[in-house]
Amino acid sequence: MKKIKAFLLTKSVGLYINFLSYVLPRKAFQLAYVFFSNPRSGKLQLESLPEILHTSNQEQLNLDGHTIQTYHWSGNETVILLMHGWESNSSRWEKLLTELLNTGSTIVALDAPAHGLSDGKEFNVPLYASFTELVIQKYQPKYIIGHSMGGITAIYHQYHYGNSELKKMVLLGAPSDFSIILHNYLKLLSLNNKIKKAFYHYTRERFQIDIDDFSGQKFLKSSPTQGMIIHDTDDTVVLFEEAKKLAATWKSATLMSTNGLGHSLHDEEVNQKIVAFLLEA
């Protein structure tokens, strides 16, 4: 019954936006963009912070009026940065964190825009990448692990900002093409072509990039960074085809497929292989 109600609500919202696109097109796109970019979960409250995050040194960084929440576990000179995905936060790394901390490494995690304890209502990849750049400047990690939208943000960051010190990058359930993400959203709400065109125009105007060019395949084409792509064949959030696209163009990366883990990829064996890949000579 809940699924039916959610389906009807979603389609009703899409129907309203489509109607609005003919009478108030600007308002229609604004509404569509809010639903697309404003996460509905993933926030944290300081008074009820998950225990794993309590064990860290917490610091808030500031960037152009934004507050960026970071978590820092001190260790040796090996610094690893963790980047979570959509409607999530840094606590999602709890099981992997245990494995990483056992190596004595220094671990840094950040909450994405509008997630965790970071402020704001809007999430977008360029903004997340700017958060990441500030954290990288401060902590200078040599290794990055990104899940889902954290993965594509790590790719975009490396392409846009460039970090010559980055040695290895691990992508977990990461999408390649932003056009696929948008297509799935438009399909979910059954939004019309007017809204699609508005998204393309807005992205070009605001971020100076065409949606069809916002592609991990293109960003990684000449990347010398060693990589590990981990993706589950049963992932229904980001299809396995996205991992195959990344692996086809990222020549210095290996693709590891799993079965039955879904999008989250929470698994002890996966975590052990990540640690082995990062710390092998």
Where are these regions (language model features)?
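Catalytic histidine-centered segment of alpha/beta-hydrolase-like enzymes
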Residues: 261-271
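Gly/Ala-rich beta-loop-alpha elbow adjacent to hydrolase catalytic centers
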Residues: 146-154
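Hydrolase active-site cap/lid region
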Residues: 163-209
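Short beta-strand/loop motif that positions the catalytic acidic residue
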Residues: 222-224, 229-231, 235
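Conserved alpha/beta-hydrolase "acid-adjacent" motif
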Residues: 236-242
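An N-terminal hydrophobic leader/cap segment in hydrolases
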Residues: 3-60
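Alpha/beta-hydrolase active-site loop
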Residues: 122-142
